[in-house]
């Protein structure tokens, strides 16, 4: 039997490893790799092994939800809690080189073993021809799927670490020391290789899944083309395109890993990829989700728009939700829904099936637009009437707000007169929550989040650290059970890795960067805004913005700012925020020494509760843009270079 060695630094000393080192993931305890390809069934299981390394996009343990400022969690925490692992260490500036958190290079501390994944993909591609009597079209599809996975796993590593070794083939155990001690490759070469794999994969992937219910999550042409678009956008973005911070970052032969010269053609190439992906998605029947009330609903137009936003993510019936291009079934949403749901009423306080701990900070709440569809700091009404200056002061809800805020109750001025996506994404003290057993706009749950109230702080670990909750992630058909310690019936849904709104906004971004403002740029932003109940970009700023900002959509810089904010709003709470701010090279500006804020949740009365408190002050320097490689890996492979600053 031929033996294999992955091209990975950490294995550089393991020259005498036996073949059994490589069989840990072979299905059904098959004795050898070759035996995994003696029948269609065992080969298919090996295909699914290649899929099994897919990162769990809905997991707060494996993702970037709390590394930056998308969510806060209680800190310090009680012992033996279930959400106090690596991401929290990174978010508070405690990443290290001895044992890095979220280590996808080695598959440790919350990270999956991506290089092992690439090795298994290579094994599959080399051995699949040995499967007897395998249908030719099925074999082509399987090969295309594995090439897609191979591209995606490379992309995941590239996005995290910058330059990486390219695992094009597995080396035999007889490989020399020099062959095994691989080098990181320039980032442009890495992007080119990933795109070439995606191009190869596309030809033999299906446009639609033949069996949606049993094949959900498997690669298709729309998925591959959408990933290609995102890869090329990443390559064109400031972190990788003309980044002078890494001017002196070179390999041992003096070859630079980054080209310090900005290349506008990368944006043009990304725009073409986005256009192609959108055309494919259109032909495959994808469209922006819009909620259709059912017979049990009693809701008005604004709540219907809210449900369109919420269900664009949380709808689990993909015959209804045609917006999700790629849904990851490797990790369903049940756990993150549990962490997002507040205690809706006093009768549920003994129910431990929900945890109310994922808390968007004040920084995120302020990001959403006013009801006019412009930033609150640029809204002429907010500025001229003093609403922005006094946004933390109390205001009493009148009947005008009765479907979003409990009439007669007080909350911060900040929570009034906001766009629908604000109320669809976030919940807060005295906010109304539609669904989870209540489907009448006149009888919604009232969130009461002050100390001593159902959704207020209790204990060391079960509370919102900021006073905000994440409404969008909780399916509205969930059901909390009274008097049942674990009684939370959750309607699970596959996590939406890519949805159509994401692609539309990417296309707008690439067009603006490549060519500047145009009707085509506005078109794709406005489609997303229209679904959110907002006027188009140009009219919104001309009608509602302060005089100095009315022409903002007319300039490339102004429109860039609008598109970036639109992406952060539309994709809020879905795990994109950290990666987006990073690729724009805005992380130092937005996070370094800028406090993460929330309400004073220790208070039982409205006045002191709505005092702004600092949760913590993150430190983000240039070195934090890329993950460190573990020191041990560098010691066994002298050809590897550590990322700058670590």
Per-region residue spans from a language model:
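Membrane-proximal, proline-rich intrinsically disordered regions
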Residues: 19-68, 250, 414-416, 629, ...
């Amino acid at each position: 039997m031929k033996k294999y060695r992955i091209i990975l630094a950490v294995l550089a000393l393991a020259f005498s490893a036996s073949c059994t080192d490589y069989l840990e993931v072979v299905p059904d305890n098959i004795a050898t790799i070759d035996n995994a390809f003696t029948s269609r069934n065992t080969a298919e299981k090996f295909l699914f092994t290649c899929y099994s390394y897919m990162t769990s996009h809905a997991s707060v343990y494996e993702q970037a939800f709390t590394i930056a400022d998308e969510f806060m969690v209680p800190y310090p925490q009680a012992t033996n809690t279930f959400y106090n692992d690596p991401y929290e260490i990174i978010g508070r500036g405690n990443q290290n080189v001895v044992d890095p958190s979220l280590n996808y290079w080695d598959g440790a501390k919350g990270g999956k073993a991506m290089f092992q994944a690439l090795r298994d993909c290579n094994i599959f591609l080399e051995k699949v021809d040995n499967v007897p009597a395998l249908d030719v079209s099925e074999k082509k599809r399987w090969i295309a799927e594995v090439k897609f996975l191979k591209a995606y796993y490379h992309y995941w590593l590239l996005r995290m670490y910058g330059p990486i070794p390219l695992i094009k083939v597995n080396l035999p155990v007889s490989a020399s020391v020099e062959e095994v001690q691989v080098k990181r490759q320039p980032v442009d070469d890495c992007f080119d290789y990933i795109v070439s794999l995606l191009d190869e994969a596309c030809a033999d992937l299906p446009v639609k899944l033949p069996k949606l219910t049993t094949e959900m999550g498997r690669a298709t042409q729309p998925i591959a083309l959408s990933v290609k678009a995102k890869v090329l956008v990443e390559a064109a973005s400031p972190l990788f395109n003309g980044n002078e911070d890494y001017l002196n970052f070179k390999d041992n032969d003096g070859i630079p890993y980054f080209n310090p010269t900005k290349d506008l053609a990368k944006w043009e190439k990304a725009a073409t990829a986005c256009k192609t992906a959108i055309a494919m998605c259109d032909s495959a029947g994808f469209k922006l989700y819009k909620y259709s009330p059912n017979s049990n609903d009693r809701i008005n137009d604004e709540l219907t728009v809210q449900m369109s936003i919420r269900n664009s993510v949380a709808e689990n019936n993909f015959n209804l939700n045609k917006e999700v291009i790629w849904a990851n079934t490797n990790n369903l949403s049940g756990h993150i829904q549990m962490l997002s749901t507040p205690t809706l009423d006093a009768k549920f306080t003994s129910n431990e099936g929900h945890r109310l701990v994922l808390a968007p900070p004040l920084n995120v709440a302020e990001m959403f637009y006013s009801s006019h569809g412009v930033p609150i700091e640029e809204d002429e009404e907010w500025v001229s009437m003093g609403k922005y200056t006094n946004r933390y002061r109390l205001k009493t809800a009148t009947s005008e707000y009765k479907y979003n805020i409990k009439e007669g109750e007080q909350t911060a001025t900040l929570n009034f007169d906001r766009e629908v996506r604000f109320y669809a994404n976030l919940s807060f003290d005295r906010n109304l929550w539609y669904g989870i057993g209540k489907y009448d706009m006149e009888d919604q749950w009232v969130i009461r989040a002050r100390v001593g109230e159902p959704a207020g702080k209790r204990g060391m670990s079960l509370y919102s650290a900021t006073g905000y909750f994440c409404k969008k992630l909780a399916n509205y058909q969930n059901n909390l059970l009274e008097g049942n310690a674990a009684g939370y019936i959750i309607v699970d849904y596959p996590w939406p890795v890519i949805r159509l709104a994401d692609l539309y906004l990417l296309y707008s971004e690439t067009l603006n960067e490549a060519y500047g403002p145009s009707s085509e740029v506005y078109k794709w932003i406005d489609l997303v805004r229209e679904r959110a109940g907002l006027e188009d970009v140009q009219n919104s700023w001309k009608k509602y913005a302060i005089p100095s900002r009315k022409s903002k959509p007319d300039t490339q810089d102004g429109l860039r700012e609008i598109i970036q904010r639109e992406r952060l709003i539309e994709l809020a709470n879905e795990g994109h925020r950290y990666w987006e701010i990073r690729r724009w090279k805005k992380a130092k500006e937005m996070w370094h020494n800028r406090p993460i804020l929330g309400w004073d949740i220790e208070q039982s009365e409205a006045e002191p509760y709505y005092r702004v408190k600092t949760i913590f002050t993150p430190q983000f320097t240039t070195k934090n843009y890329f993950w460190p490689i573990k020191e041990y890996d560098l010691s066994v492979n002298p050809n590897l270079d550590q990322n700058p600053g670590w």
